[in-house]
Amino acid sequence: MSLSRAAIVDQLKEIVGADRVITDETVLKKNSIDRFRKFPDIHGIYTLPIPAAVVKLGSTEQVSRVLNFMNAHKINGVPRTGASATEGGLETVVENSVVLDGSAMNQIINIDIENMQATAQCGVPLEVLENALREKGYTTGHSPQSKPLAQMGGLVATRSIGQFSTLYGAIEDMVVGLEAVLADGTVTRIKNVPRRAAGPDIRHIIIGNEGALCYITEVTVKIFKFTPENNLFYGYILEDMKTGFNILREIMVEGYRPSIARLYDAEDGTQHFTHFADGKCVLIFMAEGNPRIAKVTGEGIAEIVARYPQCQRVDSKLIETWFNNLNWGPDKVAAERVQILKTGNMGFTTEVSGCWSCIHEIYESVINRIRTEFPHADDITMLGGHSSHSYQNGTNMYFVYDYNVVDCKPEEEIDKYHNPLNKIICEETIRLGGSMVHHHGIGKHRVHWSKLEHGSAWALLEGLKKQFDPNGIMNTGTIYPIEK
């Protein structure tokens, strides 16, 4: 027999103390969503099941005890730290869910200069860890635009990536070891070593699990020397995306690793670089690190771009100014809310990836299908995209779209605009051989394509869920679709 809402709250208070169990209605409503539903949120409308409680967890031991209780009574839990997620992964879609808030677990445990690694609890804000490292002359190398908001547990759980990934890698390249709590309360720790061949890499059961398999309580990441004085900036305008993709590929294949390598189409470039884009595509690079390496990297980039006569160099100071204003902190989020409420104009992104052989076709097919098939195309005020994370064998593509919300209630915006646009992007990307999600995580609004994304490998993911969360209490509806 399932517990009542009141009984759930009472037992949680017994486990962690009454002061850690939040039942204020406003807090509960805010914790039923993430930024995917920002339009109804701005209008004060919450249509999902409101959680029974938000539990402010203070230790791994508390996480273990709470999960053990929830597993025994089959209560759905939604792990949460910085709450900067954008794909619905934090939504509470099951009645009487409990939000497991780890933001109070906010201690930097160790900065180990000799072994070039740092250990932090799940609720440590990335910006706090980064600032502590920079004071000592080091960096995580991880710098997503959400850096002022995001916390370490969520960054690892969503398989996040930073703006300097072409040099430093994504979060999975940085994580050395972890501590996590399984659905039944079992605490598991993966030790910190540079590499091992002791079976499959079990870090990857935890990295990117989006709270659907376990709760991340502690992470250890690599650190690097921080040398911003050596940063070199390069910017170009050019006529077409195909040429831009070719340049990105050539730079990667030749072995150069700029920290930033970005290609914007004319539409997306215009909104970021009105002062020089002139209706053209934009290429941006930054070389950094050891001065000798940065210099050679910059020279190599300039040499490759020079082979394409259509590319015109722009003043590097313009690129540096752009670079210094990249991140989204609380002030920008607040300003965006005011602007949306005032204008009814929404902006979203959907990020995918593909090999060099298909990425341009993915870009063109998605843009064309949206323009010709989306029934509310007249409401779109901007449709474009950019590549911002490149690899030896391919790159990502951010599709960026703004639209005016017209003739619908705030709670209807998602199904009228956002979900149909997501659908086109996911379908075209998978059809052409790419991945429907590059670094935001599947969440609950791309989960419909999870099986199609993985194909015959879906059995492996299913096996993980059956093994580590047999009662299905971990973030229901994320990664794994709800079976009707």
Curated annotation (Swiss-Prot):
SUPFAM superfamilies for this protein: FAD-binding/transporter-associated domain-like, FAD-linked oxidases, C-terminal domain
Top-level taxon of the source organism: Bacteria
Keywords: FAD, Flavoprotein, Oxidoreductase
Swiss-Prot/TrEMBL GO biological process terms: lactate catabolic process; lipid biosynthetic process
Enzyme class, spelled out: oxidoreductase
Transmembrane intervals: none
The FAD-binding PCMH-type domain, residue ranges: 47-226
EC number: 1.-.-.-
InterPro entries the UniProt entry points to: Alkyl-DHAP_Synthase, FAD-bd_oxidored_4_C, FAD-bd_PCMH, FAD-bd_PCMH-like_sf, FAD-bd_PCMH_sub1, FAD-bd_PCMH_sub2, FAD-linked_Oxase-like_C, Oxid_FAD_bind_N
GO MF term set: alkylglycerone-phosphate synthase activity; D-lactate dehydrogenase (cytochrome) activity; D-lactate dehydrogenase activity; FAD binding; flavin adenine dinucleotide binding
Family indicated by similarity: Belongs to the FAD-binding oxidoreductase/transferase type 4 family.
Protein name from the UniProt record: Uncharacterized FAD-linked oxidoreductase YgcU
Encoding gene, per UniProt annotation: ygcU
